[in-house]
Amino acid sequence: MKQIFMINLIAIAMCLFSCSNSKKQTNTDPSAVQAEVEANAGVKPFILTEDGVGSLRMKHPFKNMSDTDEGLYNKVEKGTFYYEPAAMKLQTYTLYCDDVEVANFMLEKQLSPIEELTVTSPYVSLENGVKVGMPLREAVTKKGMEAMIMYDEMFDQGIIYIAYGKNLRINVVNEELDDLTEQTKMKALAMTANGDLAKTSELEGKSIQLTPEDFKPEAKVACFYIDRRFEE
């Protein structure tokens, strides 16, 4: 159960990488991206499960399918990410369908299996219809969704936990709690051990269930995140 409450260094690196990618995309003409999304509005979406989406399979090495007619992505951008606190250098992969980012992930080595995957494409949805851009107030009402505030020892406060099954989460980690209404946000910030380690264990088992009204009307699904690191 500790895995739910704690984020290890690789997961933090993943979040930082995803965040930097989102900022980088602001340089793309938003009207062009929106036009492409609207043009493909009637296209049947790719379905994301905890096993992956399309040719992107979790627990398997990455196989570049950008030159095929699969349609999930047609461009791969490679790079490196150095996470100084862990002295860790990782290979980064960002996949695009024209100008729209589809997904990103990091690998320790080229042939390492994909164990974490962040999906940001509006052309991908869960089996229950939840997709990027959908209001959170609507998303959390869909079948199989779980939404709560859970205590996180690293941040010493409550964080938003929105999940679909065991390994698939929405919006990764939102320690800023910006998607919540002010009243609900205060409840999360009050979930703290105040530096007293004796109280931490008491908080670990507690959670606050979230309703659609706990989210701001403008809060939306920004990404999906699959984490399969802890499986044997």
Where are these regions (language model features)?
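Short helix/turn-capping signatures at newly exposed starts of structured segments
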Residues: N21-D156, I160-K166, E175-L180, K185-M186, ...
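A short macromolecule-binding patch
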Residues: I170
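C-terminal motif of bacterial Sec signal peptides marking the signal peptidase cleavage site
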Residues: C15-S18
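Positively charged n-region of N-terminal signal peptides that target proteins for export
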Residues: M1-I7
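Short regulatory "switch" loops immediately downstream of catalytic or recognition motifs
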Residues: L197
